Design a protein with these regions (language model features):
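Beta-sheet-dominated interaction scaffolds and their linkers
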Residues: 24-69
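Sec/Tat signal peptide C-region and signal peptidase I cleavage site
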Residues: 18-23
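Short strand-edge motifs at loop-to-beta-strand transitions and within beta-strands
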Residues: 48-50, 60-62, 94, 160, ...
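Bacterial N-terminal signal peptides
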Residues: 8-17
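Short, hydrophobic/aromatic beta-strand segments
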Residues: 72-80, 185
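Bacterial N-terminal signal peptides that target proteins for export
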Residues: 1-8
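Aromatic-lined carbohydrate-binding surfaces of glycoside hydrolases
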Residues: 67, 81-84, 108, 112-116, ...
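Substrate-binding groove of N-acetylhexosamine-processing glycoside hydrolases
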Residues: 338-353, 368-593
Length: 593
């Protein structure tokens, strides 16, 4: 009897192994980090175990590529387990989000593109609709009776099922949120892929949780534009109830990626004709909830409606504000700042005063507007999107009017930035289109032929992660981007901003969820890497508090010494990040002892 039982178990193990080999021949799962992209026909070089490392209150991502080496497969389900850690502690599967990577076409290359035209994974189609909490159903058409009109249900874009043809790949993206209260240690689980024909394959997952915690909101200041353009993508009227619902979902998506969302105007105090503010209780309550829930750390005060200067500087009144309007505007700024101070929001307050003043007359306008704000509220900061040196030495110096300078990456000059910082100003940085250093750059001859990390689909994903590293090098404390939802040719098939040249993904980080049946955004791989860069900055600041800037910069030097020299190798970023984490852990132990 014992021998028969042993033989039965032995045969079962052999058959199980045989089935696994057969499945393994039909499905191969390969792990990639969040900075890699795999083409549909590209040969894969990756691991067969997922290994990631994370602080608490951080989201860390990985990719699993599903490949079909021998025959076409039809994947019908992907599931992930809880991750089990020390003494039975868990990172629950509810804290893990899965997405299927959709491919978009780059038809015409961006200027100075680093990668060729073709298909690139970028939109992340969620397995679960974040609004309904249910899977996105594939589109189907049914007809109850011949001759009757068909009934359509489901959507064109969904996560599963999906086909993988022989020799091709399909990547799955996973976001793992590590809660604040989990014990440190290694958490193990698995991701399993099921295909038709009764075949499946799994890949082990190991998440190492480090003993430090990231703050809720972004330390690195930022401004990423407004969401007015989503009305176009969803074919709705601005300020309609549906628009407000969708706008709020975009705001939530920004917050989830450590970007301060634009505060909807309908939540702000109402401006009266005399410049005074009316605090509407319902708005105020909702605004408090918005700031708390979305971890908002900056507050842009809208420009006073009474102090708008003409965009055309050919008009004789291009820099004139009447005494009456000046008085109203100053009352507006005083009352708005008091409102923020009364609620503890004044620390991150600023006025986005002027964008790219490219004429002498624009400099004069900046001076007039800044003086008006500072006379009303000396401590209220004025932001101007401009480099930290004059375009022309004959132009007026706007330094007294500006508190936050925001140069293009290629316009940055370290020496002049240090001068502004020494005077008590802040410096942010921003990118747009493809612009090299201007002729009036102090080191033009040295940097004129160099390129900073432009933001487009046809470039390595690392260009979205590295700016916060370089910003830290220069003591730059903020990041600005002109839009995340600009008008593109066609968002899902040709996401290019034409100006008139193609800027693939320029000003466009969120895909409209319409083809997925989502009344909100579909996230891009690019914004995930931007989030990782914002999280990296939190590491920098934690280490700086435990040691000093020099210690942090020594590690960053290996990745990004300046705006024209920076790594594009994912493993170099991960190695530097781990060095920072190990330094934090070492110094934290010393600090606690």
């Amino acid at each position: 009897m014992k021998n028969r039982t042993f033989i039965t178990i032995f045969l079962f193990l052999i058959l199980s192994s045989f089935e696994h080999v057969l499945a393994g021949e039909k499905i191969i799962l390969t792990a990639l980090n969040s900075m890699e992209r795999i083409g549909q026909d590209q040969k894969i070089d990756g691991a067969h175990t997922v290994k990631i490392w994370s602080a608490r209150n951080e989201v860390e991502s990985f990719q699993v590529v599903v490949s079909a080496p021998q025959e076409n497969i039809n994947v019908i389900k992907v599931e992930i387990s809880d991750l089990i850690g020390p003494e039975g502690s868990k990172i629950e599967k509810d804290d893990i989000k899965l997405f299927r990577e959709e491919y978009v076409r780059v038809r015409i290359s961006s200027p100075r593109a680093e990668l060729p035209p073709g298909l690139y994974p970028d939109p992340l189609v969620p397995f679960i609709n974040p609004i309904t909490g249910k899977p996105i159903e594939p589109i189907t058409r049914t007809q109850k009776r011949w001759g009757e009109p068909p009934t359509t249900s489901g959507y064109d874009m969904y996560a599963v099922p999906f086909e993988v043809f022989k020799g091709q790949n399909q990547a799955i993206w996973a976001d793992v949120y590590v809660p604040k209260n989990v014990p440190v240690g290694i958490y193990n689980g698995k991701l399993r892929v099921f295909a038709k024909g009764g075949i499946s394959e799994q890949i082990p997952i190991a998440v190492t949780v480090w003993d430090f915690t990231l703050p809720n909101g972004p330390t690195h200041r930022n401004h990423f534009g407004s969401f007015g353009n989503i009305a176009r993508y969803f074919s709705i009227e601005r300020n309609s109830d549906r628009f407000k619902q969708i706008e709020m979902r975009y705001c939530e998506a920004m917050s989830e990626h450590r970007i301060n969302p634009p505060i909807p105007r309908y939540l702000l105090p109402q401006s009266n004709d005399d410049g005074s503010l009316e605090i509407i209780p319902e708005r105020h309550t909702t605004l408090k909830e918005f700031i708390s829930k979305l971890h908002v750390t900056d507050f842009e005060i809208p420009r006073a409606p009474f102090a708008r200067l003409p965009s055309s500087t050919l008009r004789p009144d291009y820099k004139t504000i009447s005494p009456t309007n000046r008085k109203k505007a100053q009352r507006y700024y005083k009352e708005f700042y008091k409102y923020l101070k009364d609620n503890g929001w004044e620390e991150g307050a600023y006025v986005y005063m002027l964008d790219e003043p490219n004429l002498r007359e624009n400099y004069e306008q900046a001076f007039v507007l800044g003086r008006l704000v500072h006379e009303a509220v000396p401590q209220l900061k004025c932001l101007v999107v401009e480099q930290t040196y004059l375009q022309d030495p004959s132009w007026p110096d706007i330094d007294p009017a500006v508190d936050i300078w925001c140069p293009l990456w290629s316009f940055i000059a370290r020496e002049t930035i240090n001068e502004k910082l020494a005077h008590g100003d802040e410096v942010w940085s921003y990118t747009a289109l493809v612009q090299r250093a201007p002729r009036y750059h102090p080191q033009y001859q040295t940097v004129k032929d160099f390129d900073p990390p432009y933001w487009h689909i046809d470039r390595p994903l690392t260009v979205y992660r590295v700016p916060t590293w370089i910003n830290y090098q220069y003591n730059i404390t903020g990041l600005l981007y002109w839009s995340t939802v600009t008008t593109v040719i066609e968002p899902w098939s040709n996401p290019a901003f034409a100006h008139p040249r193609h800027y693939n993904g320029g000003g466009f980080l969120f895909y409209p969820g319409v083809p997925c049946g989502i009344d909100g955004p579909v996230i891009s791989m690019r914004i995930k890497n931007l989030r990782d860069g914002m999280e990296d900055y939190e590491y920098f600041m934690i280490l700086e508090r435990l040691s000093d800037k020099k210690t942090v910069k020594k590690i960053i030097d290996a990745i990004a010494p300046d705006w024209w020299n920076f790594s594009k190798t994912p493993n170099e970023f991960l190695a530097a990040r781990e060095r920072i984490a190990q330094q934090i852990l070492k110094l934290k132990k010393v600090d606690e002892s």
